[in-house]
């Protein structure tokens, strides 16, 4: 949960998640939809899917006991170099590094690394150096101390160099370039897309929702169906096409309900939400994992992305 998310945000989610899934076996036995629902609001849902898959793999391949080595941990879904290194060193005292953003920043300043350190040769060099620094005695404490140094003193802005215990050997400080390090990759402009969504209400008051395919972005989450507009395509035409392709239905596009702007890691969207009339026919999961006709109070039982949660809130408020 702490990957990409601050501690203050994570704590209530963490406590609630453990109430739902108090043990690894409970998590492994749970339905993915229930895991995503418990994760709802944290974002980066691939983390939840990987956590669920890793729990299942630990149960089936390791007898329900977490592997005790870096190599075995690295084979679990969602366990990259950092996570595997942190668990192996802190929980099992294996002499391996745990290189997160804080550690990269400390080492880049300490060694005056003037190349971008997120990827490539410089990143591999820092990982190798970190591996050489980890002591055989209490490797987990060393890794945590290095991370804490980056979080508390060697901060991204205004590093507190006068208080730093390694200031005497810091090459970045000696050269007066510590504030310029680590070198960051040029920030790319995020593309923008217009996306449509249909609030389709049947005569009995039920709403049509669709579940995204597991391999899709936000896979496993539910949504008000729709999709991305093609160049020079009007919003109503886009919505009619998407609903036909996704569910095999014909709809009448009504008035605009709302427009929601939202940013993801690599792109931004304007979500245009329309009230739509159901013209008949039985939905089919043509380009989605599943579909449901759901009463308004029951929408709370499904896991939705943040944009769809805002639509649900509007419906609950009577819009």
Regions found by a protein language model. Give the residues of each.
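Catalytic cores of DNA base-excision repair glycosylases
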Residues: 2-175, 250
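N-terminal strand-loop-strand
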Residues: 178-223, 252-255
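Short, well-ordered beta-strand micro-motif
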Residues: 199-201, 273-277
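Acidic, metal-coordinating catalytic segment for phosphate/diphosphate chemistry
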Residues: 167-196, 263, 299-317
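The catalytic Nudix box helix
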Residues: 224-258
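Acidic pyrophosphate-coordinating catalytic loop
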Residues: 187-191, 215, 260-271
């Amino acid at each position: 949960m702490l990957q990409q998310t601050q501690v203050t945000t994570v704590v209530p989610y963490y406590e609630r998640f453990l109430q739902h899934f108090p043990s690894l076996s409970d998590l492994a036995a749970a339905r993915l939809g229930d895991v995503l629902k418990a994760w709802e609001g944290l974002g980066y849902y691939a983390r939840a899917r990987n956590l669920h898959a890793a729990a299942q793999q630990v149960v089936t391949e390791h007898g329900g006991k977490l592997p005790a080595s870096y190599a075995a941990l690295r084979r679990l879904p969602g366990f990259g170099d950092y996570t595997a290194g942190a668990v192996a060193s802190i929980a099992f005292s294996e002499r391996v590094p745990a290189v997160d953003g804080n550690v990269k920043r400390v080492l880049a300043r300490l060694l005056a690394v003037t190349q971008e350190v997120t990827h490539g040769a410089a990143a591999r060099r820092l990982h190798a150096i970190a591996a050489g620094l980890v002591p055989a005695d209490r490797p987990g404490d060393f890794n945590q101390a290095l991370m804490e140094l980056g979080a508390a003193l060697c901060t991204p802005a205004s590093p507190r160099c006068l208080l730093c215990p390694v200031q005497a050997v810091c090459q970045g400080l000696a050269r007066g370039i510590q504030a310029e390090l680590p070198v960051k990759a040029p920030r790319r402009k995020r593309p923008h897309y217009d996306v449509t969504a249909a609030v389709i209400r049947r005569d009995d008051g039920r709403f049509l929702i669709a579940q995204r395919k597991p391999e899709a972005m936000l896979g496993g989450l539910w949504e008000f169906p729709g999709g991305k507009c093609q160049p020079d395509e009007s919003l109503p035409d886009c919505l009619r096409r998407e609903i036909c392709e996704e569910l095999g239905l014909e709809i009448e596009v009504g008035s605009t309900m709302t427009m929601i702007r939202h940013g993801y890691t690599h792109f931004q969207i304007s979500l245009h939400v329309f009230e739509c009339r159901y013209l008949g026919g039985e939905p089919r999961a043509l380009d989605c994992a599943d579909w449901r006709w759901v009463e308004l109070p029951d929408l709370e039982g499904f896991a939705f992305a943040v944009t769809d949660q805002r639509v649900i809130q509007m419906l609950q408020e009577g819009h």
